[in-house]
């Protein structure tokens, strides 16, 4: 029996398989990145890192719903200096994508310069829906996306991935801005702006009131975004949003995603999701007569 090839090359980086741990709530420390890889992730995106340390919002920061989670963590992170101290002494045998956020193109560029030694690539958080002055507030405008990507590309020779917000009328405008500025890839989607209300307290549950919705409920929205981006752009698209089963993963690949990120499914189903999804993809490829993941990317676009 010939095993189908799961390994991929993305922007010059070699991944054992197309599954990447998404930036979110399961990737704060190196031990979690290593665990993700041991459990079958081909690579890892870190928690978003800023210039100064941030405590994040007070609890409650997460609400579990029947079809996903709403979170408003508030971008808690140790700052770039704390991040460098945290990774000191570690070496990783998988691609480490460092997520960064800032309030201006200059801040993004500064972080890329400072963290280039430890990052195999950068993911630009242009899409967090609940942090004032950051993320989506910057990334909803194509001209801002262009300026940030260009500044980071000028500051580092590492691959640059722009993470796009779905909270906009046409996500391809953002994708084209990133591509025109020299981005090596885009990732989509970040969470959908959302709220949950306690009917007895008669007020929003999250301390920040508004958060980002992720998980199985956002999958069709994410899939459509990936499909539209893959039809429009020449650079790779990394699919994110509600991927929970191998069937979900195959849908995203067929819709044009070159790689996939998984976050909420780890919270809901445990680290085993990486292995289960990889096994399902490999079995699907074999049974359908394909020899590699790359052969099915974008087949649904034709």
Curated annotation (Swiss-Prot):
Catalyzed reaction equations: (S)-dihydroorotate + NAD(+) = orotate + NADH + H(+)
Cofactor note: Binds 1 FMN per subunit.
Xref: PANTHER family: DIHYDROOROTATE DEHYDROGENASE (FUMARATE), DIHYDROOROTATE DEHYDROGENASE (QUINONE), MITOCHONDRIAL-RELATED
Keyword Flavoprotein annotated: yes
Broad class of the protein's primary localization: cytoplasm
Subunit structure: Heterotetramer of 2 PyrK and 2 PyrD type B subunits.
Signal peptide interval: none
Cofactor: FMN
Protein name (Swiss-Prot/TrEMBL): Dihydroorotate dehydrogenase B (NAD(+)), catalytic subunit
PROSITE patterns named in the record: DHODEHASE_1, DHODEHASE_2
NCBIfam families on file: PRK07259.1, pyrD_sub1_fam
Gene from which this protein is expressed: pyrD
Chain residues that bind FMN: 23, 47-48, 125, 163, 189, 215, 241-242, 263-264
Main enzyme class: oxidoreductase
Molecular function via GO: dihydroorotate dehydrogenase (NAD+) activity; dihydroorotate dehydrogenase activity
Matching InterPro entries: Aldolase_TIM, DHO_dehydrogenase, DHOD_1B, Dihydroorotate_DH_1, Dihydroorotate_DH_1_2, Dihydroorotate_DH_cat, Dihydroorotate_DH_CS, Dihydroorotate_DH_I
GO biological process, one term: 'de novo' UMP biosynthetic process
Binding site for substrate: 47, 71-75, 125, 190-191
Subcellular location: Cytoplasm
EC numbers for this chain: 1.3.1.14
């Amino acid at each position: 029996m010939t095993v189908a090839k799961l390994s991929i090359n993305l922007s010059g980086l070699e991944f054992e398989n197309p599954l990447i741990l998404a930036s979110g709530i399961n990737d704060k420390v190196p031990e979690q990145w290593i665990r993700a890889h041991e459990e079958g992730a081909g690579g890892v995106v870190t928690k978003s890192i800023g210039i100064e340390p941030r405590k994040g919002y007070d609890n409650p920061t997460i609400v579990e719903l029947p079809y996903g989670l709403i979170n408003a963590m508030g971008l808690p992170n140790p700052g770039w200096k704390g991040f460098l101290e945290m990774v000191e002494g570690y070496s990783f045998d998988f691609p480490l994508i460092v997520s960064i956020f800032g309030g201006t193109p200059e801040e993004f560029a500064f972080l890329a310069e400072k963290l280039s030694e430890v990052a195999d690539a950068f993911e630009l958080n242009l899409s967090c829906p609940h942090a004032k002055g950051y993320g989506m507030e910057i990334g909803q405008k194509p001209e801002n996306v262009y300026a940030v990507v260009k500044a980071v590309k000028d500051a580092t020779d590492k691959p640059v991935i722009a993470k796009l917000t779905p909270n906009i009328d046409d996500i391809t405008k953002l994708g084209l801005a990133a591509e025109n500025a020299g981005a090596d890839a885009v990732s989509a989607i970040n969470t959908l702006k959302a709220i949950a209300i306690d009917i007895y307290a008669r007020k929003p549950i999250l301390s920040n009131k508004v958060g980002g919705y992720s998980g199985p409920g956002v999958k069709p929205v994410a899939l459509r975004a990936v499909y539209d981006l893959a039809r429009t752009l020449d650079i790779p698209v990394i699919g994110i949003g509600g991927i929970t089963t191998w069937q979900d993963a195959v849908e995203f690949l067929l819709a044009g995603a070159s790689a996939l990120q998984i976050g909420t499914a780890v919270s809901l189903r445990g680290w085993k999701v990486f292995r289960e999804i990889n096994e399902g993809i490999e079995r699907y490829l074999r049974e359908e007569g394909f020899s590699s993941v790359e052969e099915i990317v974008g087949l649904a676009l034709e």
